[in-house]
C-alpha cells in the first residue's frame, strides 16, 4: 500500500489558522487509513488519484493562484490609472463572480504594500517551473503559466524573491508608473 507525500496548498497564515488544503495521491485503502491525520493539520483533504496525482493537483493550484494574483494586479492598476480608488474597487468586486479567496487575501496586502512573506515569490517560481516541466512532459499548453513565471522571475531579479507573491503588483506598478 502506497500513499504519495501529499501536497499542501497554503501560506504561512493558512498554516497558522489550520485551513491548509491537502491534495493526496496514492491508493485508496492507504488514503482512508491516514486521512484523519491530515485532517488534524488542515481543513481539506482530497484524494486526487493514484501516486503523483496530489503533486499534479498542487501544480494546477499554483497556476490558478498565480494567474489570479496576476489578473487582480492588472485590474487594480487599470482602475487606479483611471482614477478609481482601489479600496472601492475591492469592495465592489469581492462579493461578485470575480471575487475570490486570493483577492480577499492579497488585495489588502497590495493596497498597503505589505509584501511580508506568506508565500514567497521564489517558492512560487519553483512551483511554476515544476508546472511547466509537467506540462511539457504531458503535452499540455500553458502560455499563461510561462508569462507569470517570467513576471515572477523579474520580481526575483529585482529584489522581491523573498517577498510575498502579492508583490506581482510591483511589476504592474513599474510598467504603469503608478503606486496602487
Regions found by a protein language model. Name each.
Residues 78, 92-96, 147-154, 171:
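Short acidic/histidine-centered micro-motifs embedded in hydrophobic/aromatic stretches
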Residues 5, 68, 124:
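Short, conserved glycine- and acidic-residue-centered signature motifs
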Residues 80, 136, 156, 170, ...:
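Short polybasic/polar patches that bind polyanions
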Residues 164-180:
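Short, basic/aromatic-enriched C-terminal tail that caps enzymatic domains
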Residues 14-19, 40-64, 107-114, 144-146:
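Conserved Rossmann-fold dehydrogenase catalytic segment
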Residues 23-57, 65-100, 134:
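Internal alpha-helical scaffold of NAD(P)-dependent oxidoreductase catalytic cores
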Residues 1-13:
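Single conserved hydrophobic/aromatic residue that forms the stacking wall/gate
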Residues 51, 55, 99-101, 105-165:
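Interdomain hinge/lid region at the active-site interface
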